[in-house]
């Protein structure tokens, strides 16, 4: 595979890669949290008509069968009741209770358990990556926050209320797809296109052309996210306090400005390392790598809750 291409590793290759990373990083602790990728998970919100004193568990399983694209016997299911907002109105006088449903494919869970055991971690807690991302960026100050996570092949929008996930929206758009667009249009190898994308400077004479090709991959996704945010604010009566942009593909010059234009909101490039201590001379490095480490740091912080 070329630099920047999305890749799916075989089990043995995953084991070797994980062991190598742990060894080279000189990590001494033997505890971990596993952040399950969304590709092996499912997260959604449902609204259930029920009185406040009614047990929702059996109703949630009924609703889960409707929305989860797999048999419930094939997934590990979890759920939590959430409050959409203080200004939420009852629909037609009915008592509606909002529930967040999360499910992980059992076969994926089993594969990753074996991977963790191979690396010496015995039954680490597991959560879906969206929850790690929110933990990594939620400061406790924001009532309502949004996160745009720009990945290799998909870009996700998370909306959180008091640090709890309320909405998620995913679109096929990402850094690897942007590189493919540059490669195809300029008739250059994928590796050369990736190198050009990650090293280009605003002063480069080809920057405008590269940026146009790059941004074309995200235009529709960012417009969709803007619509989802506006619908959420209209439904809940809430105002999104802050929008974080995270993910390894978030650092291309001008992506934050493009997102700001689409969402009509100020954008903060994610820096989860504000939650931990590090030497002052590493400040610039932490800011540069922050968007790529949001999930990892957020997962690690789970052990300190």
Regions found by a protein language model. Name each.
Residues 1-23, 206-213, 283-287:
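N-terminal phosphate-binding loop and adjacent alpha-helix
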Residues 10-38, 58-61, 263, 267:
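Phosphate- and other anionic-substrate recognition elements at nucleic-acid/protein interfaces
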Residues 18, 25-39, 116, 121-125, ...:
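Short glycine-rich phosphate-binding loop at a beta-alpha junction
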Residues 26-28, 34, 93-195:
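Small-residue (GG/TT-enriched) beta-loop-alpha framework at ligand/catalytic clefts
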Residues 35-138, 274-278, 295:
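Active-site neighborhood for divalent-cation/phosphate handling
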Residues 132-135, 176, 250, 268-305:
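Glycine-rich phosphate-binding/hydrolytic loop that grips phosphoryl groups
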Residues 195-242, 249:
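Adenine-nucleotide phosphate-binding core of ATP-dependent small-molecule kinases
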Residues 238-268, 273-274:
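Glycine-rich phosphate-binding loops at beta-strand->alpha-helix junctions
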């Amino acid at each position: 595979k070329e630099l920047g291409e999305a890749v799916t590793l075989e089990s043995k290759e995953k084991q070797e890669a994980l062991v190598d990373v742990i060894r080279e990083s000189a990590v001494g602790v033997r505890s971990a949290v596993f952040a399950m990728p969304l590709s092996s998970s499912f997260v959604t919100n449902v609204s259930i008509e029920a009185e406040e004193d009614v047990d929702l568990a059996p109703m949630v399983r009924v609703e889960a069968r409707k929305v989860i694209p797999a048999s419930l016997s094939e997934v590990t299911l979890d759920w939590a009741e959430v409050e959409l907002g203080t200004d939420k109105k009852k629909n037609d006088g009915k008592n509606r209770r909002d529930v967040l449903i999360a499910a992980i494919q059992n076969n994926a869970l089993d594969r990753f358990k074996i991977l963790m055991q191979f690396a010496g971690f015995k039954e680490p807690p597991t959560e879906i990556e969206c929850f790690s991302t929110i933990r990594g960026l939620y400061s406790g100050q924001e009532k309502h926050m949004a996160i745009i996570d720009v990945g290799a092949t998909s870009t996700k929008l998370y909306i959180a209320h008091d640090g709890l996930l309320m909405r998620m929206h995913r679109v096929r758009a990402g850094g690897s797809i942007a590189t493919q667009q540059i490669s195809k249009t300029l008739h250059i190898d994928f590796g050369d296109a990736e190198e050009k994308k990650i090293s280009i400077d605003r002063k480069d004479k080809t920057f405008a052309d590269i940026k146009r090709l790059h941004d074309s991959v995200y235009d529709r996704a960012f417009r969709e996210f803007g619509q989802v945010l506006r619908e959420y604010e209209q439904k809940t009566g809430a105002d999104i306090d802050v929008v974080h942009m995270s993910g390894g593909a978030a650092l291309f010059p001008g992506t934050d400005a493009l997102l700001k234009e689409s969402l009509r909101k100020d954008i903060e490039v994610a820096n989860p390392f504000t939650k931990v201590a590090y030497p002052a001379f590493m400040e610039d490095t932490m800011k540069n790598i922050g968007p790529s480490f949001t999930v990892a740091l957020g997962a690690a912080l789970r052990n300190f809750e």
